[in-house]
C-alpha cells in the first residue's frame, strides 16, 4: 500500500514539475529582470548595505534585519544541505548550474515580493501587521481575484504542514542524528510496521517539544531566536565548507567544468547514470525554489512585518536572502559534494553531504559528521519555526482571522513535526515539491500582473533617493 502511495506521489511530483511550470518560473524571473533593468546586479551592494542598517520610523513589528532573519530562518534549512544533495544525485552536477540560474532570476522576483508585501500590507488597529501574497493579490489585483488569494493561502498552509515546514526538516534532523549516533542501525525498534533507530524516535520527540516551546511565543520570539541563530549557523557552515574547498582547491576547476557541462550534457559527466537535461533542470530549479523560496511567496509574509515605510528598501533587503541562501550557501554545499564525488556512490539525502565532509576534511570522520549534524539541526530547527509563522498567517487569512483555527493549526504542526522522522527521504521531498509548485503558481501570476506597480515604486524610490539622503 505504502509503495503504491509513494509511486502516486512521485508521479504527481513529475506532473506538476513538468516543462510548463519550469518555463513559467524562468519566464517570470526573466520578465521581471528585464523590466527592472537587471536590478539584482546593479543594486546588490546597496541591498547588502540596507540589510544591516535599520530604518527609523514606519509601521511594523520587527526591524528589516529581523524580518530578513525570520525569512532566512525559514529558507536556510535542509534545502541547503539535503536538498542540494538530492538535486545533484538525481540530476548530476549540472543541477547546481540550474540552481544558480533559478536564483539569479529569482532575486528579481524576491525583490518584487518584498515591494508588494509592504505596499499592500494591512495595519490593524492594534498595530498588528498582516501581509503577503494573499493581500497583494486581493488589494492589488482586485476583489474578483480573492479566490486566487484564498488558493495561495490554502497551499501555503499545506506547505507548512506537509512540506518545507515540517516533514523535510525533522526528517533531515533525525537522519543526521542517526548517521552520527547509530549509523549501522544497531539499536532499533519496530514502529508503524517498520524498524527505526532509537535515535530517530528520540530526535523526533525532542524537536517536537522544542518547537512547541518556541512557536507559542509568536513572531517576536521567532525573530529573537532567528536573529541570534541564523547568522551564527550560516557562518559556521560556510567556514567549514571553505575549509573543505581550501584543502581540495586543485579539484575546484574540474568541479566547475563538470557543473557547467552537466547542465547541458549530463551523460558526459555522469556516464549515462543520471537522466537528461530536463531532469537536471527540474531538480535544480525545484530544489532551488525549495531552498531560497523565491517565487514561492513565503518571504513576503515575513517582510510585511518589517518596520519600514519604503517598499523598495524592503524589496532590496528581501532580495539578499536569495543571494545568501543559494549563491553562497548552496554553492558551497554543491561544490563540496561534486569535488569529493560523494554524489555518485549510491547514497541519498544527508548521507551524501556527510560523506563529502568525511572525505574532504582532514578530521576524524566522527568530527566531520558532528559538524554537519550540528549545522543541519540548527538550520532545520529555525526553518520549522519560520514556517509555523507562515502557515499561521496563511490560515489566518483563509479562515477570516479565526484564532481558534490558528491554535488548532499550531498543535497539528507540532504533531506533524513528531511524525516527520518516520517517512522516507524520497516521499518527504516529493510531497514538498508538489505543494511548492502549487503554492508558487498563484504568487507568480500576481507578480507578473503587478509588475507595473513594482516598476513604478522602484523608479519613484530611486528618484527620491537622488534628492534626499534620509531614505
Which positions does each model-derived feature cover?
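N-terminal alpha-helical transmembrane segments of multi-pass membrane transport
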Residues: 1-78, 88-95, 106, 418, ...
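Transmembrane helix-loop junctions in multi-pass membrane proteins
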Residues: 5, 36-40, 79-84, 160-173, ...
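Membrane-interface loop-to-helix entry segments
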Residues: 24-31, 35-48, 152, 170-177, ...
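Helix-loop-helix module between adjacent transmembrane segments
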Residues: 32-33, 73, 102-127, 134, ...
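Extracellular/periplasmic helix-exit of transmembrane alpha-helices
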Residues: 33, 113-120, 125, 241-258, ...
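Flexible loop linkers connecting adjacent transmembrane helices
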Residues: 38-64, 86-96, 100, 108-144, ...
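Alpha-helical membrane segments and immediately flanking helix-loop junctions
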Residues: 57-90, 116-140, 151-154, 158, ...
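Membrane-interface alpha-helices at helix entry/exit sites of multi-pass transporters
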Residues: 57-61, 92-101, 139, 143-151, ...
